Regions:
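N-terminal Rossmann NAD(P)H-binding glycine-rich loop of SDR-like oxidoreductase domains
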Residues: 4-24
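C-terminal substrate-binding subdomain of Rossmann-fold SDR/epimerase-dehydratase oxidoreductases
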Residues: 20, 203-335
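Conserved glycine-rich Rossmann-like NAD(P)H-binding loop of the short-chain dehydrogenase/reductase
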Residues: 26-35
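Rossmann-fold cofactor-recognition segment
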Residues: 41-54
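NAD(P)H-binding glycine-rich loop region in Rossmannoid oxidoreductase-like domains
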Residues: 51-94, 107, 124
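NAD(P)-dependent short-chain dehydrogenase/reductase
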Residues: 125-134, 158-236, 249-251, 259-265
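Active-site helix of classical SDR
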Residues: 148, 152
Length: 335
């Protein structure tokens, strides 16, 4: 039986990755500061450990693993990343985790390790036009990320690639673009735009009002979590290092995203634009390289992903006692 370890297995993407590896027949160890919030872990062994401590990293890397997935990081959506209040923690905590995990894997002579970077490492100056952002993998330099989160991701990419060159490690680097889906954070201040808008619309009665940061014309692409997991595993099993974008090319404005969710929810709410942290004006995955190197790209539409995500968040909102009264019968009947 093959063995894998998933660091960050208590998080959104990590918990889904554990499930996928288990379906393939792997024995899986999950590691995180916490268990998954919304469902029991599928891991065979789950270790609560702070990977900022090198002793803990050596403890969890206590045997040969066929695949190591390093997704653990201090991160969140725009409300966490772009306020400036969390910059020191973001850089310090995530950098320590990556330094420690690479050293632990190197000492154990584990060769194959996957690192989840982010599209936030792309230069801000290439993403000022909401209709024509540039995120080709070779556009990363000259470097100019729009946040300390992006700078840390860029540093850690180089760290993994350096360990690959100098220590013969078979590293894989993916740049994630706005992953969403069920069992993701939806209300703790770290949620990303799809979850935040699903929550706001679920909480608001028909004809009510929600807030959107900025003018809503800023653009993004969003990738459903199952496709993210599939792309990550495919990259891990390939003979190519990356870095490569794992994201959707279906770009949408935040206003249009809200409209799409309203359609799925079967309600109309008004939008009030307010000041708030925004990030770049436009971002979209460029999938030319992943098509060339892996012969694969995500195929699920944003609408289909949201159609699976909104009902899950609606149920969470109802169970938390935050939904308007008319939402409860709809959730019970599945409409």
């Amino acid at each position: 039986m093959k063995k894998a370890i998933v660091c960050g297995a208590g998080g959104f993407i990590g918990s889904h990755l554990v499930k996928a590896l288990k379906k393939e027949g792997f024995w899986v160890r999950g590691v995180d500061l916490k268990y998954p919030e919304f469902a029991p872990t599928a891991a065979d062994d789950f270790v609560i450990a702070d990977l900022r401590d090198p002793v803990n990293c050596r403890y969890v890397i206590d045997q040969p693993f066929d695949e190591v997935y390093q997704l653990a990081a201090d991160m969140g959506g725009a409300g966490f990343v772009f306020t400036g209040e969390n910059d020191a923690d973001i850089m310090h905590n995530s950098a320590l985790i990556n330094l420690n995990m690479l050293e632990a894997c190197h000492r154990r002579n584990l060769k194959r390790i996957f690192y989840s970077s982010s599209a936030c490492m792309y230069p801000e100056h290439n993403q000022m036009d909401p209709d024509n952002p540039m995120t080709a993998e070779d556009s990363a330099y000259p470097a100019n990320p729009d946040s300390e989160y992006g700078w840390e991701k860029l540093f850690s990419e180089r760290l993994y690639l350096a360990f690959g060159r100098n220590h013969g490690m078979d590293v894989r680097v993916a740049r994630y673009h706005n992953i969403f889906g069920p069992e993701g954070t939806w209300r703790d201040g770290r949620e990303k735009a799809p979850a935040a808008l699903c929550r706001k619309i679920a909480e608001t009665p028909d004809g009510g009002e929600i807030e959107i940061w900025g003018d809503g014309t800023q653009t993004r692409s969003f990738l459903y979590v199952d496709e993210c997991v599939a792309g990550s595993i495919r990259l891990m099993r390939s003979d190519w290092t990356g870095p490569v974008n794992i994201g959707s090319e279906e770009m949408v404005s935040i206003n249009a995203l809200a409209e799409m969710i309203m359609g799925i929810a079967g309600k109309r709410v008004n939008i009030r634009h307010v000041p708030g942290p925004l990030g770049v004006r436009g971002r979209n995955s460029d999938n030319r390289l992943i098509r060339e190197k892996l012969g694969w790209e995500p195929s699920e539409t944003l609408h289909d992903g949201l159609a699976k995500t909104y009902p899950w968040i609606l149920q969470e909102v109802i169970e938390a006692g935050l939904a308007p009264p008319e939402a409860v019968p709809a959730a019970r009947t599945g409409t």
